[in-house]
Amino acid sequence: RIPMLLHELERRGNSLFRWRSFLPLVLVPPALWMGWGAPSWANHLGYQAFCWAVGFLGVAIRAKTIGHVPPGTSGRNTSEGQVAEVLNTQGMYSWVRHPLYLGNFFMWMALVLATGRGSFALVVALLYMMYYLRIAMAEEAFLHAKFGERYAAWASTVPAFVPKFWGQPRSSWVPAGNTFSLRHVIKREYNGVFALVLGFFFLDGFRTWGDGLASWATV
């Protein structure tokens, strides 16, 4: 039964992998709703700056990862599935096996935290783990089938999502084997950065609108 369950999770992960760039859009309506009438402390400049910093930490992680990856690696492919001619083990991949998903987490949470709703942030964090865990399982099954023992040896010493700076084995930085390509980052990431900034502005707009309606109702 366990192998069958793993097979089912892998199958679902492959389906989610193809649509992983679009499925998070289902969070937009509830995030906007939660942002409407947010607690007053969520409007403070310091807290908003913190949320922006969390979001751009995610952008930085993704940029550092993408800027060094060689062509032909497992990456964006929403119609044909996964492609990997090279196994990434250096740069950000020497710290965690899924640095892009770690970056995504910070970008998601930046917008969720900006709503000022702690319970909503907790729910989204749990949904994120359930969502990306299946995608990661499918990706790892694909890479293990492709690269065999080489992949298994690397994966046994590198954590999946959170760098390990204590105990053994401990995450250790291995410099990327190729130079950083800003052009590649801009080509790959401008949509994500635009979506992040647009999300903040939409949340701010809904919050301002909600505050205006509340003030009008008390007149």
State the predicted function of each range.
Residues 1-90, 106-219:
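Membrane-anchoring alpha-helices and their flanking helix-loop junctions
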Residues 94-108:
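Conserved SAM-binding loop
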